[in-house]
Amino acid sequence: MVPQVLLFVPLLGFSLCFGKFPIYTIPDKLGPWSPIDIHHLSCPNNLVVEDEGCTNLSEFSYMELKVGYISAIKVNGFTCTGVVTEAETYTNFVGYVTTTFKRKHFRPTPDACRAAYNWKMAGDPRYEESLHNPYPDYHWLRTVRTTKESLIIISPSVTDLDPYDKSLHSRVFPGGKCSGITVSSTYCSTNHDYTIWMPENPRPRTPCDIFTNSRGKRASKGNKTCGFVDERGLYKSLKGACRLKLCGVLGLRLMDGTWVAMQTSDETKWCPPDQLVNLHDFRSDEIEHLVVEELVKKREECLDALESIMTTKSVSFRRLSHLRKLVPGFGKAYTIFNKTLMEADAHYKSVRTWNEIIPSKGCLKVGGRCHPHVNGVFFNGIILGPDGHVLIPEMQSSLLQQHMELLKSSVIPLMHPLADPSTVFKEGDEAEDFVEVHLPDVYKQISGVDLGLPNWGKYVLMTAGAMIGLVLIFSLMTWCRRANRPESKQRSFGGTGRNVSVTSQSGKVIPSWESYKSGGEIRL
């Protein structure tokens, strides 16, 4: 399995160069047909790309990138966002305390961010405590504001170090680029005004230790170098290669995106500035995995078809389609003419769209022109249908193109919230939504009665309140008694407000009850 994983790169290389996986391969050069026996049939070698005439192999040494160094060098880092949480409290007359929380941003300092990151990585409880809401202070009949600053550390935030100009690239940076980390500049600004990016290593060195020496075989024809067989046995062509310096080392960028440093006698042009080395990400990893699975599957299908042919002593057009070479290069083409099995040498090329080889109805384009058929039969299982259309067995299954469409629809990369192009930031310094998931919830709360006094003060206040209450009750009772006394006297005589005269025992006339009362003790 491991050799197959290493040797599928030619097929993948063409897919990366052209932006999508080739859906088919067809001969652009087709030699004369000759009859063969079924024992001459063989499954093609889909693990080698061959160049015409370069058969002279000689040992040589070259330099290539270490495993894991693909398009750019990964630099791990983190983002630091400053958040201020404000607690506003108001205590009313009866002692109810209302607390309202608000959040806004501030721009953090690199030193503070580095300290917060170290706390988080070390599991220091000070980091979690720094994220808590402030404990609100309060005073009776006053509004009190309490603030607390927090630093939100989001990691990892991986950036790409460009080995060409040593700049950092990520969607979190304004314009996608940061000039780089130096001794004087230890951080990068981000597309959020109150967030900075910093590397995990406080003293990053330019990690250009990315090369390794390897040995292989040079494929040449005379003084011309056509390509080489690398240390893993994979042939790589120098067609379309260009010169490119990587971390100051001059080398060649091949068509499949790989980079090697080797001596050649041919003058090679310089690469355009926009060409990178081995563009590689998580999605291409998935594609590589599917390509390997597909190549293994196709190899097994070819061997099964070949075994069936040998066992049954019969062959069909559909079985011949399994013997087609799946990668560009030299191979064989097979067909059946007049019940005779035929073979021809062929040089295969990649096909990216079906229109390239079927430009019109009934036309199979080979070598720039429509290839003739014999009684409706072409080669490699391709036939002419009853309605005059060219029928290719793989056209119905679309081969690996289905995997590409599946990847486009199902692969969702994990990204930093600031790297999401759909993120819309709020105006001003209002706290963004992406920091809320890292902080406790804030809400308006109302406490019970609390006057903000110590325990002894509370008892004094309660005692004074009780005494005041008693005084008020006593005063009210006294007032009520005084107010009701004249009314009760009048009601005892059923009076209407007139004077009543009475006669005492001595016969003296007393004009009123008050006069009688003032006359001293009277015996009835």
From Swiss-Prot:
Main location as per UniProt: virion
Regions annotated as coiled coil: none
Residues on Virion surface side: 20-459
Annotated glycosylation sites: N56, N223, N338
Residues spanning the membrane: 460-480
InterPro entries for this protein: PH_Rhabdo_glycop, Rhabdo_glycop_CD, Rhabdo_glycop_FD
Uses, biotech or industry: Primary surface antigen capable of inducing and reacting with virus-neutralizing antibodies. Almost all human and veterinary vaccines are based on the functional aspects of the G protein.
SUPFAM superfamilies xref list: Viral glycoprotein ectodomain-like (SSF161008)
Secretion signal, residue range per the UniProt entry: 1-19
Pfam families: PH_Rhabdo_glycop (PF24834), Rhabdo_glycop_CD (PF24833), Rhabdo_glycop_FD (PF00974)
One cellular-component annotation, GO: viral envelope
Annotated lipid attachment (S-palmitoyl cysteine): C480
GO BP term, example: fusion of virus membrane with host endosome membrane
Protein task: Attaches the virus to host cellular receptor, inducing endocytosis of the virion by using different host proteins including TFRC, GRM2 and ITGB1. In the endosome, the acidic pH induces conformational changes in the glycoprotein trimer, which trigger fusion between virus and cell membrane. There is convincing in vitro evidence that the muscular form of the nicotinic acetylcholine receptor (nAChR), the neuronal cell adhesion molecule (NCAM), and the p75 neurotrophin receptor (p75NTR) bind glycoprotein and thereby facilitate rabies virus entry into cells.
Protein name: Glycoprotein
